[in-house]
Amino acid sequence: MNSNNWLGFPLSPNNSSLPPHEYNLGLVSDHMDNPFQTQEWNMINPHGGGGDEGGEVPKVADFLGVSKPDENQSNHLVAYNDSDYYFHTNSLMPSVQSNDVVVAACDSNTPNNSSYHELQESAHNLQSLTLSMGTTAGNNVVDKASPSETTGDNASGGALAVVETATPRRALDTFGQRTSIYRGVTRHRWTGRYEAHLWDNSCRREGQSRKGRQVYLGGYDKEDKAARSYDLAALKYWGPSTTTNFPITNYEKEVEEMKHMTRQEFVAAIRRKSSGFSRGASMYRGVTRHHQHGRWQARIGRVAGNKDLYLGTFSTEEEAAEAYDIAAIKFRGLNAVTNFEINRYDVKAILESSTLPIGGGAAKRLKEAQALESSRKREAEMIALGSSFQYGGGSSTGSGSTSSRLQLQPYPLSIQQPLEPFLSLQNNDISHYNNNNAHDSSSFNHHSYIQTQLHLHQQTNNYLQQQSSQNSQQLYNAYLHSNPALLHGLVSTSIVDNNNNNGGSSGSYNTAAFLGNHGIGIGSSSTVGSTEEFPTVKTDYDMPSSDGTGGYSGWTSESVQGSNPGGVFTMWNE
């Protein structure tokens, strides 16, 4: 065998295993059952003729090329043999390798030599090469013949073509290719949404050849959200040295939060934030609205023999979401994907329960617990507010209204202690003080006022020894507001004025004593020669002026009750 022969079978004419055959070399071989298909070179006559000008089809004189055996060995051209051997794969060559080369040549000098698989045509009918390209056309290489050979072939009406066969793309070539540009993200082939997965190689399941398991991180509408979920899970599992889709500096806040959580808890938190799958008209997982009565119904899938479990209908979607969460915890444990935070539920009671605590049980208990917790918070707020709350009491002065504040504390004095100034003002007969001189009456009133203020000041000093932080005005103001029954003391006096009325008429006076914000107010209403009902007048006044003149300015009077509005006057307002 020649050392230059690369075909794998002998080209010697003495080989008896290759008997000569005659072929009708037209457009298609007569013995071919199947035509040429795509990704092959077809030799087609554009004019539809396969013979010479005389209409005769050229015959194969010597199939093995007895006339020119040297050219067969020097040119290394492929001679076609039995069609059953060479065309069983619908290609021009036996598929020895993926890149087989087929050379077909035509020589006008040897018209009867068909050992080179020559197709005889007329000078003006040139054969054309038709190329059917598929998806792998970029892998095909066509080598043209040299210019000298092309010139000789064109002159004789032949053509030379070198063809490199294409390799079909196998299914295994596409296996494992990513459907997303991000790591750990795949695109669902049906829904078109994106899912994030993480491969946890820290464990090995029984019966698996590959170490580890796939951790589902949820489905997402956006590809970048799924990529971020993968990054967070990868940082939790493998630390900052892992490869992420986005810079680690984008996750500084999440990295601090994940330090206080386990892997399972953090993955569950990531999955709770997923929003990729349709949930009907509700924003909660496992909750849909009933199409007839509009109530919310809850379902959970893949629990009862890999089927959906109907959980019931609820008036609100929050209750339906809670029912789904309880069922998810019951069937899937701590790794369950819930609508609300898992610490809202009594996980231990749910897992230990022999039945599913749904149907007004767990949801109502949850609401009761929330109501109790909110009431406790309100009580704590009230206690904290009461410790710093200042009770405001208004004091009426001549210049305006000011507000004094006092902490809500019980008044330390007993009831009997502040009664002394009131008793000293009641049922006092002051007729022996009545003179014709107005100055004497004013002196008496001034003396009575000073005695009362000294009495009050003594009690104030006793209290200030116990509570040095509060002044007397604030304490008595708060005490009098909390004990309104002690505010009014009625002083009835009967004065007969013989000087002014000349003995012809009598005057009746009703005087009301009132302990106001800062001292004592005295109001009076009078009628002359009448027995009608007298109104009670409450009079407030300011403290004595600081200039030492002893004047009483800023007195005001207010009618409290009575059918006679007349006779109200301002005292000591000269």
UniProtKB/Swiss-Prot annotation:
Induction: By auxin accumulation. Residues 536-566 are annotated as: Disordered. One of its GO terms (cellular component) is nucleus. The keyword Transcription applies. Residues 554-563 have a biased composition (Polar residues). It is found in: Nucleus. Residues 181-247, 283-341 bind DNA. Keywords: Activator, Auxin signaling pathway, Developmental protein, DNA-binding, Ethylene signaling pathway, Nucleus, Repeat, Stress response, Transcription, Transcription regulation. GO terms for molecular function: DNA-binding transcription factor activity; transcription cis-regulatory region binding. One of its GO terms (biological process) is telomere maintenance. Stabilized in root meristems by reactive oxygen species (ROS) mediated oxidative post-translational modification triggered by RGF1 hormone peptide in a RITF1-dependent manner. Expressed in roots, seedlings, flowers, and siliques. Also detected at low levels in leaves. In roots, specifically detected in the distal root meristem, including the QC. This tissue specificity is regulated by auxin gradient and depends on PIN proteins. It comes from the Eukaryota. Belongs to the AP2/ERF transcription factor family. AP2 subfamily. Probably acts as a transcriptional activator. Binds to the GCC-box pathogenesis-related promoter element. May be involved in the regulation of gene expression by stress factors and by components of stress signal transduction pathways. Master regulator of basal/root fate. Essential for root quiescent center (QC) and columella specification, stem cell activity, as well as for establishment of the stem cell niche during embryogenesis. Modulates the root polar auxin transport by regulating the distribution of PIN genes. Essential role in respecifying pattern and polarity in damaged roots. PANTHER family: AP2-LIKE ETHYLENE-RESPONSIVE TRANSCRIPTION FACTOR, AP2-LIKE ETHYLENE-RESPONSIVE TRANSCRIPTION FACTOR PLT1. This is AP2-like ethylene-responsive transcription factor PLT1.
